[in-house]
A protein has these predicted regions:
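Ser/Pro-rich intrinsically disordered low-complexity regulatory regions in eukaryotic proteins
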Residues: 1-2, 9
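Short, Lys/Arg-enriched, disordered terminal segments
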Residues: 1, 295-298
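Conserved mixed alpha/beta catalytic, RNA-binding, or beta-rich assembly cores of soluble enzyme
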Residues: 11-295
Length: 298
């Protein structure tokens, strides 16, 4: 199905950020939800040499909020807010300085709290990147609307991404392929933020029965997922019947945290129907890892 969008009315602007170093945290040990203290690798920011969209979101030893790829931000607060607002998932990213100058990648997601943007590059590009390298993004997607579905609000989504997500219609509603469902009772860190346009919200994996019921062991970075009974139109609000679609941007975390979801589509009236599809992943839909041996979901 061809989505009717107002993309011809959207402004495309250039924003830029610098590759940020991985960040430390006071104290080496942190307590996991099961009560076991661990020395954790702080997984946000920096350059990940062997973690990319399409890889498992869980199972990485001693990691907290592990993100894929490369993260960028700006040292100036106002400029960083602009970067986080205007960069949209699926936008083109171009290395503007350093040894990898001219190489291209893709915007994957945005992370609240640290306020940075996550990018995907091919492994051979990653090897030539350094902290401080500047990345420019052709920001396109702010103001996007679905003309036939006014209740469904796109957020942080490049129009080209929505065209590749295999979205359809059924009985007057959008059908969106996702890998997993997330019930409202799991939503954790991020609730209370006034806007879903510039970050993410976590869902908790601390209950073993729920973890097993929803099959989260197969969760992958870049998976498209559906949050049930949550409306992200004006912040993260519980509302029965609402449905939100987002992308997994990081792995598990300490109590109250968990894998993060950057919002792509939300409907307070529930005019989105999630359809389970194990292949509903950012890397798969955009063909980012063609030629690589495909690993099975666990």
């Amino acid at each position: 199905m061809a989505l009717k969008m107002n993309e011809d009315k959207l402004a495309k602007i250039l924003v830029m950020g610098e590759i940020s170093h991985s960040m430390g945290h006071p104290g080496s040990f942190h307590v996991w939800p099961d009560g076991v203290p661990q020395v954790l690798l702080r997984g946000w920011a920096g350059i990940k040499l062997n973690v990319r969209v399409g890889d498992p979101a869980l199972g990485w030893e001693g990691t907290d909020h592990l993100e894929p790829g490369v993260t960028i931000r700006n040292p100036d607060h106002s400029s960083n807010l602009s970067l986080n607002l205007h960069a949209c998932v699926g936008n083109e990213a171009i290395v503007a300085s350093g040894d990898a100058k001219g190489e291209k990648g893709t915007v994957v997601a945005k992370h609240s709290g640290i306020e940075h943007v996550i990018l995907d590059f091919a492994p051979e590009v990653i090897e030539n990147l350094l902290f401080g390298d500047k990345i420019k993004i052709k920001a396109f997607g702010v103001g996007l609307r679905l003309l036939d579905f006014p209740d469904v609000k796109p957020m942080s989504a490049d129009p080209g991404l929505l065209k590749k997500m295999k979205i359809g219609t059924k009985q007057g509603k959008l059908t969106v392929p996702v890998t997993h469902l997330i019930p409202a009772q799991l939503i954790g860190s991020g609730v209370g933020e006034v806007s879903a346009y510039t970050g993410d919200v976590d869902f908790q994996l601390s209950d073993p029965a729920t973890f097993e019921e929803y099959g989260y062991s197969s969760l992958r970075l870049g998976d498209f997922v559906a949050i049930l009974d949550y409306d992200h139109s004006y912040g993260y609000a519980y509302r029965q019947g609402a449905v939100t679609i987002g992308i997994i941007l990081h792995g598990d975390g300490t109590a109250g945290h968990g894998p993060g979801v950057t919002t792509l589509l939300t409907s307070g009236a529930g005019n989105i129907v999630p359809v389970i599809d194990p292949n509903a992943n950012f890397a798969t839909r955009l063909g980012l890892r063609k030629g690589e041996k495909k690993s099975k979901r666990r």
